[in-house]
């Protein structure tokens, strides 16, 4: 969670105190969309594989839909009810089908795979990848297997220090790999 404080720069008094969760979620979604624009090429059709149907799953989809036509989404969440809510909420942003996966492997068939879960276990396996798939492991813990990271063609981060401190690369950074 976060808090946004708006302070008058001339007088130094508070103008507003706001919950920062929404803007943080939107920013994180935008990071993926902008990175994808440069890695994949703007304007292409996308089949999105999504792990995590919470607020981050929503904002990731919304941001990607700003730059790409999402022709299909396959979403996996440990809570089927959350995946069903996501599917209903995201209809305006997706130009095609929204599939709810009952097995995490089923969401790995997209052009991109976005992991936005709170899982502390490595559940995304390297062998699930299709050649050319772009993986965005956005969670605070390591959602993808070591092999996903070690066999990646490229690893792109927005902030090296933060990437080595938490998320998919933390274990690799702390062990010097």
Specify the residue positions occupied by each region the protein language model found.
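N-terminal ligand-binding/catalytic initiation module
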Residues: 1-25, 33
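Rossmann-fold NAD(P) dinucleotide-binding segment
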Residues: 110-112, 119-138, 146-147
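Glycine-rich Rossmann-fold phosphate-binding loop(s) that bind the pyrophosphate
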Residues: 52-54
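Short helix-loop-beta connector
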Residues: 40-47, 69, 130-131
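NAD(P)-binding Rossmann-fold cofactor-contacting core
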Residues: 67-90
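Adenosine-phosphate binding glycine-rich loop
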Residues: 148-177
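N-terminal Rossmann-fold NAD(P) dinucleotide-binding loop
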Residues: 57-58
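Short acidic low-complexity segments
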Residues: 94-110, 124-125
């Amino acid at each position: 969670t976060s808090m946004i404080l708006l302070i008058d720069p001339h007088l130094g008094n508070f103008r507003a105190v706001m919950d920062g969760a929404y803007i943080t979620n939107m920013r994180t979604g935008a990071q993926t969309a902008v990175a994808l624009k440069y890695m994949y090429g703007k304007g292409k059709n996308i089949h999105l594989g999504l792990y995590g149907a919470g607020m981050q799953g929503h904002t990731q989809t919304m941001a990607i839909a700003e730059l790409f036509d999402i022709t299909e989404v396959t979403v996996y969440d440990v809570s089927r009810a959350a995946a069903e809510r996501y599917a209903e909420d995201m209809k305006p942003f997706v130009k095609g089908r929204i599939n709810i996966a009952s097995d995490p492997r089923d969401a790995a068939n997209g052009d991109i795979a976005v992991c936005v879960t709170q899982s502390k276990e490595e559940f995304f396996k390297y062998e699930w990848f299709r050649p050319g798939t772009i993986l965005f492991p956005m969670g605070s813990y390591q959602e993808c297997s070591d092999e996903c990271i070690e066999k990646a063609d490229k690893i792109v981060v927005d902030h090296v220090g933060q990437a080595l401190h938490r998320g998919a690369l933390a274990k690799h950074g702390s062990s010097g790999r």
